[in-house]
Curated annotation (Swiss-Prot):
The lineage of its organism: Eukaryota, Viridiplantae, Streptophyta, Embryophyta, Tracheophyta. It comes from the Eukaryota. The gene is matK. One of its GO terms (cellular component) is chloroplast. Signal peptide: none annotated. It comes from Alliaria petiolata. This is Maturase K. It is found in: Plastid, Chloroplast.
Length: 504
């Protein structure tokens, strides 16, 4: 992103915050294409549905698209003819994908430049380890043990597209770009709402950009009201969210909110409140009573219904008591567990025992959901019995083995933070036996005969990588003991959720 931003630093259009001229410059499409490939290489599973965009990209297509945008009448085509009437061998949907990627990348670059300028003069420590998904778990272990209740909320969508356009007004100052953006949405798609899952046929980068804009908008309102209703000042809001005319926009909302709910801001005061957003959801943790959690619950329901015009049912907001309920958080089932301890204290000639109870956050592996993901991808049946992967039998033996080993290591890597690894060993067993059955099916042999012919060395690949990592972390004597079975390890290099973890 820093390299791409350099192309925009000395551009006259950027000095005036005009984005519309960038749609007619070829080098911007090259930057967008390179940015897309970088994200594709980091997380290929998200962008597999749009592989045609990367295969068909060329400078000649960009020139044709620019010429077509100069003649906007040629862009206006009925929705039913979106995949028909190909222009120079390409459908209109393909050209819309190019425009959507370009718009998302341009606004993202501009927002990163603006965000970088807000950090100037502020002494902020940058830690790349905080980018890891696992970095949030040590924080929760330290904080959630003091809390009683957690509000688990699924961020609602779809949302009306016109509200998204209005939201982008506070990031994009150029009216021409906003008009062009609205034109593309309504002329090409003719949608009323944004639904990422149903519109997955189009570009995911573009829809993730729209979705993140929607989340950023509601979070800015939430943080603003939280700051007004709390005695503690929040410094992160000022640094992380730069809003243009935000206070002018929020003034009307606050007036309506306070008039309709006169006691809400006072009742929502709670200095011990933690908010964590993740994967289309967020949790709100507090040590207060269920009454306060219900007030926050109906506050969010009214916020989305009144301000964002999204019909949101209160049943989608779950209030979990950590001592009794499991919290489904980033692929783990987390709950508070009482760990009794007996401490012997001796003072002079007298000794006595002290019973102490330590509250500990227990993160368990959701074996049922992972088996459901494995069954969905044809690694096993719904009961967890391994089956052969028929679609991989045309590949080479080394390719099949390496792919199974990589999947097994990724799952083991992600769930290393659980103390009870019995479920993890069961998942690894399913993958190993599935690998053997796949290879045996390819060679038209039985599993017993195949293992007898190749020996046990075939499965050593599943253990080599994990053993090397753990041997570097722990002493050899400790690594060889059974105590390693209950050791929790949080890795700080996990940036994305695995598809098997992301099962719904």
């Amino acid at each position: 992103m820093x390299x791409x931003x350099g192309y925009l630093e000395f551009d006259g259009a950027r000095q005036q915050s005009f984005l519309y001229p960038f749609f007619f410059r070829e080098y911007i499409y090259v930057l967008a294409y390179d940015h897309r490939l970088n994200r594709l290489n980091r997380n290929r599973s998200i962008f597999l549905e749009n592989a045609d965009f990367d295969k068909n990209y060329s400078s000649l297509i960009v020139k044709r698209l620019i010429l077509r945008m100069y003649e906007q009448n040629r862009l206006i085509i009925p929705t039913k003819d979106l995949n028909q009437n190909p222009f120079f061998g390409h459908t209109n949907l393909f050209y819309y994908q190019m425009i959507s990627v370009l718009f998302a990348v341009i606004v993202e670059i501009q927002f990163s430049l603006r965000l970088g300028s807000s950090f100037e003069g502020k002494q902020l420590k940058k830690s790349y380890n905080l980018q890891s998904i696992h970095s949030i778990f040590p924080f929760l272990e330290d904080k959630l043990t003091h809390f009683n209740y957690v509000l688990d909320v699924l961020i609602p969508y779809p949302i009306h597209l016109e509200i998204l356009v209005q939201t982008l007004r506070y990031r994009v100052k150029d009216a021409s770009s906003l008009h062009f953006f609205r034109f593309c949405l309504y002329e090409y798609c003719n949608w009323n709402n944004l639904d990422i899952k149903k519109k997955s046929i189009l570009n995911p980068i573009f829809f993730l950009f729209l979705y993140n804009s929607h989340v950023c908008e509601y979070e800015s309102i939430f943080f603003f009201l939280r700051k007004r209703s709390s005695h503690l000042r929040s410094t992160s809001y000022k640094v992380l969210f730069e809003r243009i005319f935000f206070y002018g926009k929020i003034q009307h909302f606050l007036k309506v909110f306070v008039n309709n709910f006169p006691a809400s801001l006072g009742l929502l005061k709670d200095p011990f409140l933690h908010y964590v957003x993740y994967h289309g959801k967020f949790i709100l943790a507090t040590k207060d009573t269920p009454l306060l959690m219900n007030k926050w619950k109906y506050y969010f329901v009214n916020l989305w219904q009144c301000y964002f015009s999204v019909w949101f049912q209160s049943q989608k907001v779950n209030i979990n008591q950590l001592s009794k309920d499991n919290l489904d958080f980033l692929g783990y089932l987390s709950s508070l567990r009482l760990n009794p301890l007996v401490v012997r204290s001796q003072m002079l000639e007298n000794s006595f025992l002290i019973d102490n109870v330590r509250i500990k956050l227990d993160s368990k592996i959701p074996i049922s959901s992972i088996i459901g993901s494995l069954a969905k991808d044809k690694f096993c049946n719904v009961l967890g019995h391994p089956i052969s992967k028929a679609t991989w039998t045309d590949s080479s033996d080394s390719y099949i083995l390496n792919r199974f080993v990589r999947i097994c290591r990724n799952i083991s890597h992600y769930y290393s933070g659980s103390e009870k690894k019995k479920n993890l060993y069961r998942i690894k067993y399913i993958l190993r036996l599935c690998c053997v059955k796949t290879l045996a099916r390819k060679h038209k042999s039985t599993v017993r005969a195949f293992l007898k012919r190749l020996g046990s060395g075939l499965l050593e690949e599943f253990l080599t990588g994990e053993g090397q990592v753990l041997s570097l972390i722990f002493p050899r004597s400790y690594y060889a003991s059974k105590r390693l079975y209950r050791v929790r390890i949080w890795y700080l290099d996990i940036l994305y959720l695995n598809d098997l973890v992301n099962h719904e």
